[in-house]
């Protein structure tokens, strides 16, 4: 009886660990597909449509942390998608390249929660000039879609470099 009980407990623990990992893997694949679609959008100059809205929940929020906003700035889904399209309209190209992905944890329980953390390197290009920068994101999911992204990057440095290139 003890042996059966211990086997059941061990199997339950193993199943719950795999279940968390499965959520992470599924969400990670979803996020990687989004990055691929964003990169493709910028690579092909004739591609005008950006069909990435379905990657996000309707109440998606992008949180950024520029200088002067220690609690961050919230950007809703519509404005976030418009800002990506606006970059292309300004002849700015973006490529998200080098990335390191890690599973995220719940901020209260410290247990794996299916979220994705990513350290990335990106390049913004205008004509033949490039601006390279790094950033960090935490990405939360709800029912397989991106609910929120928190991003930390050197926005001031990127902005200064863009101003120099656009003179």
Which stretches of residues belong to each language-model region?
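Short, low-complexity N-terminal intrinsically disordered segments enriched in polar/charged residues
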Residues: 17-50, 54
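Short, solvent-exposed coil/turn segments at beta-strand boundaries
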Residues: 52-57, 139-147
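Short, surface-exposed coil-to-beta transition loops
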Residues: 117, 130-137
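Short, cysteine-centered beta-strand-loop-beta hairpins and adjacent loop/turn segments enriched
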Residues: 69, 123-132
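A short hydrophobic beta-strand element
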Residues: 112-122
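Sec-dependent N-terminal signal peptides
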Residues: 4-15
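A solvent-exposed, acidic/Ser-Thr-rich amphipathic alpha-helical stretch
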Residues: 50-114
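Low-complexity, intrinsically disordered terminal/linker segments enriched in charged
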Residues: 148-167
């Amino acid at each position: 009886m003890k042996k059966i009980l211990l086997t059941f407990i061990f199997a339950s623990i193993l199943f719950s660990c795999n279940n968390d990992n499965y959520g992470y893997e599924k969400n990670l694949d979803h996020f990687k597909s989004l990055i691929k679609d964003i990169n493709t959008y910028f690579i092909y100059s004739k591609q005008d449509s950006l069909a990435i809205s379905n990657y996000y929940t309707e109440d998606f929020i992008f949180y950024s942390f520029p200088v002067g906003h220690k609690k961050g700035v919230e950007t809703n889904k519509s404005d976030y998608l418009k800002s990506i399209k606006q970059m292309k309209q300004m002849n700015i190209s973006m490529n998200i390249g080098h990335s390191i992905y890690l599973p995220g944890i719940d901020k209260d329980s410290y247990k794996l929660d299916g979220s994705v953390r990513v350290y990335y390197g990106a390049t913004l290009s205008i004509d033949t000039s490039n601006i390279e920068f790094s950033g960090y994101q935490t990405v939360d999911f709800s029912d397989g879609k991106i609910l929120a992204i928190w991003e930390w990057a050197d926005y001031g440095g990127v902005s200064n470099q863009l101003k120099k290139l656009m003179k």
